[in-house]
Amino acid sequence: LFKDTYGIVYTGATGFVGHEMILDCRYLHDETGISENDIAKRLMDYGYHAPTLSFPVHGTLMIEPTESESLWELDNFVTVMQTIWQEIQEVKNGSADKEDNVLVNAPHPEYEVVANEWNHSYSREKAAYPIESVRDNKFWINVARVDNTLGDRKLLPTRYGKFE
């Protein structure tokens, strides 16, 4: 599945990977404007912690499922990654706005989804409940997208949401 969509870096001679796999997202940015960072943040909308970004290879996502994950969880993760792939394709084929889509605006916290104003070209439902398993067991992220560089340099925001 992943080798035919995202691409996998570092497979063995038989095409298998070890306990982790590195998804190659480098070409996506050139084709669609979508980065590995956008995918990682969109995973939060699906209830997953963002994977390791750009290590050991820049422009990639390192996925490390553990032995303790159930088959249902692994199958659900595959469904999530397939759905995110479809969202990327919507940007690529022009059916989703390149500047205003579920990926570049992820994650979508509850306070944004339920706000009176919604200024996006996609629905609140697509932002918050993209697949049925999320509807059944939603984990809301507490904050919207944060500027990564600023967040790394100014680790503690003020209570008014501005970095000092």
PLM regions with names:
Residues 1-164:
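Non-catalytic terminal extensions of PLP-dependent enzymes
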